Amino acid sequence: MKPLNLITLMNYAWHERNKKNGDQYSEECMNLCTHAYAEIKDIIGYNSENEQKLFITFQHLFVFIMKSDNEFLQGEYDAYCKFSKWAKYKPLKVEEVNNLYKKLTIDNLVQDISYIASFRNRIDDRKYEALVLAFCFLSLLGDSSFDENEYYIIRCFFNKGYDYCPNDWETFKREWK
């Protein structure tokens, strides 16, 4: 298992953000997600209940990152829609995204990430890293910031003591950029 470094991933996401237009960036975000999603889907089997749980888990993360900064950004929504269609699920409408966001709790999101992270040792390191990078991309899509809520959720993908992720928001802000 290869250690992850949040600062390195965020620097890469920021650098790529400045080189691409919004459509290219949302496409890249979706592509990064699909590799890990497909491999996890192979592990859990093609049982509709398991597939649905996996999709809903990813959907929760997309919705949280889309809405956590209290702004609706079309690019983030476009990336979510592309991913949903790729996964063969109907994307939520904007109003449904807003309603789901109101129901999400931090505990739900931590459970969702724990579920995904439980597959880390069973999928290719590069695919897990690509998945985390996809959510870094998504958090920067359409805006110029990475907010505290996004930081605390994304850091749940990191294993404390093995991966590098600053311990708190203030340390992260000092180290990034």
Predicted segments, located by residue:
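Small-residue-enriched hydrophobic alpha-helices in membranes
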Residues: 1-67, 71-177
